[in-house]
């Protein structure tokens, strides 16, 4: 069984776990157990099922922020948006298409990281081999490694200095409250650098078309109308989508 299949099975089991108690609770409202926290023989805290469900439902509200700020999604969606502007297309591809493509490309890029989280943290927790707190700590390790690999040292040092923390001995010990903004800042810089390189060939086409129209005295004709077919043709001839998607996926170094 592959890690991805096991992850899908784990999510399905989690959904069944969340839905199963509701008929019984509706039949007997007094059977709802109190939220309890107990300490086992090893000194570790264990949470009741009710508290675990509450924590899971609370964590679900942070999924959009997690996807946007702790994965490759930010760089990918910004590059796609700049590409659409460079082509001169205001609404094609639509926002829904760009976001969907960015999400699936993010899943592809982050698959090695998610596989490590599944094998090192999620599966041991679901098998009751480790407590929830230890599972969260183990899940942070591959995620931090990914973000540190994409974060510039100058950006990380900036936020460490702003936080006035002096107890951080190594980049791996950086807390997420400092690492995440540093990672996002680096991702924005990288996305704009890639976007600048994408703009150059299309900008040259716009300048050439504008110069030709000016020489012909057709100043009332918008250069965008004439240059748009040439830009689309150039993008198709060089297999632009495969080139950009392949470059984006390879820029993270995880695939």
UniProtKB/Swiss-Prot annotation:
Alphabetized UniProt keyword annotations: Bacterial flagellum, Bacterial flagellum biogenesis, Bacterial flagellum protein export, Cell membrane, Membrane, Protein transport, Transmembrane, Transmembrane helix, Transport
Membrane topology (UniProt): Multi-pass membrane protein
GO cellular component, one term: bacterial-type flagellum basal body
Subcellular location: Cell membrane; Bacterial flagellum basal body
Pfam families: FliP (PF00813)
Transmembrane regions: 7-27, 53-73, 97-117, 194-214, 232-252
GO BP: any one term: protein secretion
Domain of life: Bacteria
Family of the protein in this entry: Belongs to the FliP/MopC/SpaP family.
Physiological role: Plays a role in the flagellum-specific transport system.
The protein's name in its UniProt record: Flagellar biosynthetic protein FliP
Gene (UniProt): fliP
